Amino acid sequence: MVDVYIQGGLRTPIGLFQKQYASMRPEYLGAAILNALKKRYPESHIDDIICGNAVGTGGNIGRLTGLLSDYSEAVPATTIDMQCASASAALGFAFAKIKAGLSENIIAGGIESSSLQPLRTYADKDDRTGSYYVAQFSPDSTDSLAMIRGAERVSQKYQVTQKELYQWTLKSHAKAQKALETGALSPIILEMPGKKDEGIRSKISEKLLSRIPPILGPDSLTSAANSCLTHDGAAFLLLSHQVGEFKICDMAQVAGDPRFSPELVYKATLKLLKKVNLSMSDIDAIEWNEAFSVIDCLFQRYFPEDVNRYNLFGGALAYGHPYGCSGAINLLHVMQALRVQKGRYGLCAIAGAGGVGISFLIERVGV
């Protein structure tokens, strides 16, 4: 089997719903990243482009992205939909193809535009009726709030308090603001004139968060104060058989009860650590996609001694969660955390709608 390395990668600044990328189609965001990677790695012959996307217009939007870029039309492209875990799935397929010797160099990641998410309509003969923005994730539910309800169930199961949830939101924004001020993430963000990570808030407080009403009624916990908003962005990485700065050691994929989908980030992490025979104390930088604050609470419940190495630059509560590319953003952030920390091992994990989860372990080469 072939060792798989990450040569590098980039993401766009992440835009809020209907803000800086309100009218920009996601394939153009993706093409901008592909063009930057082509300039950065001009000698790499690309065998495939694998693109995650969750709420786009359908078709093979990854191929459209490739055709809009400076890469040759002879480079194939595939689109993957695993909802929140789409980019992680794309990276996983790229990892597997290179490891099996089927490809040598693959660009993988994802694109998303919540701002341009189309309204879909069920066919006349479908037993489901009407129009929808949110797809059906499990056989027994067509609820558009399925992910919110999942976060609420996990919050209740682990007896999380509202104060805990607020504290994690505040931590995420504070870390992200510090990273912004120090330029810690600048090496992995494509410079786009007039664009920035729009979600970061420097002036928020628990008092302000407490004014935001819960989504599922007065006795519930989940609200916009402890959930990520909807966003636009793109992120891709170049995976290769050639030695690079980071090696992908292994990955894990899991599935479980869709009603408790946030838990799958923990289960994916646990499976991966068992596969590689490591404990969390061996990991120098950890990224979980914090679509909800309860995911941070899960980390603290299971790994209380490792919180200081968790989401070093803040997470999706601050930056946002452009579903189809979040997994690639997580991997880029953990790579940058390893550079800053001068660490060896990095782990990132993400849960997805429908009760799925994916995790990756990477190693900084030469450490």
Indicate where each model-derived feature is located:
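Glycine-rich loop/linker segments at domain edges
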Residues: 16, 96-158
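Conserved beta-ketoacyl condensing-enzyme motif
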Residues: 22-85, 89-92, 97-98, 104-106, ...
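Conserved catalytic cysteine-centered active-site region
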Residues: 53-104, 142-146, 203-229, 302-334, ...
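Active-site-proximal alpha-helical scaffold in enzymes
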Residues: 80-112, 155-185, 237-242, 322-343, ...
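Active-site pocket-lining segment
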Residues: 249-318
